[in-house]
Amino acid sequence: LKIWNGYRSIPENSIDIEGKLIRNIGTDLPVTQESIDCSGMTAIPGLIDAHVHLELNPDDHKAPDKPHPNLPSLMEERAKKMVMAGITTARDLGGGTWQEFSLRDSINAGLKLGPRLLCSGQPITSPGGHCHFWGGEASNITEAKQVLKRQVERNADLIKIMATGGRLTKGSSPTNPQFSLELISEIVQIAH
């Protein structure tokens, strides 16, 4: 077994795992009840995917017309695939059905397999702006507070503001601002 610590390969060649935790990393640790031969394999630190949307089909590259009837199962499968690929933490930066929150809570409770999820819920966007179909539209600070309130009520881990347009939403451009700097500053102050 090769062990990569994020900077270099280290001389240790054994990992002792108890339950879900790494108990020890060393050289030729004693063989326990269950040993797995990892010859030719490399262990790395868990990867972080900083921008996912578990609600979206990664193969479509377009906004959904309506939620898929099997969306919870599809999201669970996507989360499982992430873990199998070495992703141990992911930030879900937008959805409209709140199902990523249920999945996050099930993963945290040990009921589902998936990475640690940090969820933002409905991103704050301008009316008709990027990802408006997720329900986070706000044209002023009063409307932005309403979106923020929904996020807090759902225990959002972070708040996402669509400062510019994006490629997913027709008529929206990543180079065009959606909000004034003053409104963004107000939203950030309230979110803190």
Where in this protein do the model-derived segments appear?
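Histidine/acidic residue-rich metal-binding segments in metalloenzymes
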Residues: S102, E143-H192
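N-terminal metal-binding scaffold of metallo-dependent hydrolase/deaminase domains
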Residues: L1-V31, M41-A43
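Short, acidic/polar
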Residues: L71-A79, S139-V152
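Divalent metal-coordination and catalytic microenvironments
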Residues: L1, I15, K20, G40, ...
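Metal-associated gating/positioning segment near the N- to mid-region
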Residues: M41-L111, P127-H130, E182, E186
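The substrate-binding groove and active-site-proximal loops of carbohydrate-active enzymes
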Residues: F133-A138
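Conserved beta-strand scaffold positions in the cores of enzyme catalytic domains, especially
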Residues: Q33-D37
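A short, structured active-site edge motif that brings together acidic residues
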Residues: L118-T125
